[in-house]
Amino acid sequence: YFSKKPVGGELAAPGWLRGVARVLSYKPASFTRVAREYGLRLPRRTVDMLSADVNLICSLFTQLRGDSLVEPDVGVGPIYYRAPGELPQIVREPRERPLIYVGMGSSGSADILAQVLRQLSAAPVDVLVGGGVQLSDTSMLGNNIHFAGTVPAHLLAGHIDASMTHGGEGTVQTACLAGVPFAGIAMQAEQSWNIEECVRYGNALRFTKNDVRRGNVRDILDRLLSDEGMRARARQLGEAMRTMDGAALAVEKIEDYLRAAR
């Protein structure tokens, strides 16, 4: 991303950022302190400091496309948190209307989450809200909003009809695994990248804080539920993900490196 010009449909950093990456030598104080304590010598360039003997690239789309990588980068595919426990009761019981999963995680904004849920309160859907951001006042929310704490999101495939999440990589990966469209809101730059890859693939929509403040959540939800092209792409991606085991492949790649280093 930082070292090459874009080829075809691949995403790459703009030219000015690639230029900066080649010369930037900034080191966070915590890195230099630890290096000093343990007698380590840090690389001159910042981008080199962020590399290792083996870099496991957990990107879904890098693996899906079969992108060629340069050592020490090795593609392994998605690795996401598999929360223990069962799915909440609202997921397991019979229902007559769509079930929407909302997961804003710890990086989300309580104000944005509250506004999203208020707009979904008037929709003819049930809403399952995962853990993370805590709301101090839920009195304005409808009885179709169900809070569940930590949800084993990797088990939601076949149970939900769409989701609305932040753009953290693990959250985006489990949203894709569910095989239904999602709408993603970025809380930081890295999250924009994760959402953008899914938008380009065709299984997701991006939305912003301004969309929320303008009351556009219902329109976004309607498209997630009605856009058959997007729903087909989401099913396709979910099926592809179920053939991947990033964690197992990561172990294999680490063991390969250790054997070769003997």
Indicate residue ranges for each PLM-predicted region.
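Short, acidic/turn-prone active-site loops that include or flank metal/cofactor-
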Residues: Y1, P78-Y81, V151-A153, M187-E190, ...
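Active-site-proximal region of nucleotide-activated glycan assembly enzymes
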Residues: Y1-E71
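Donor-nucleotide binding loops and adjacent catalytic segments primarily
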Residues: T62-A162
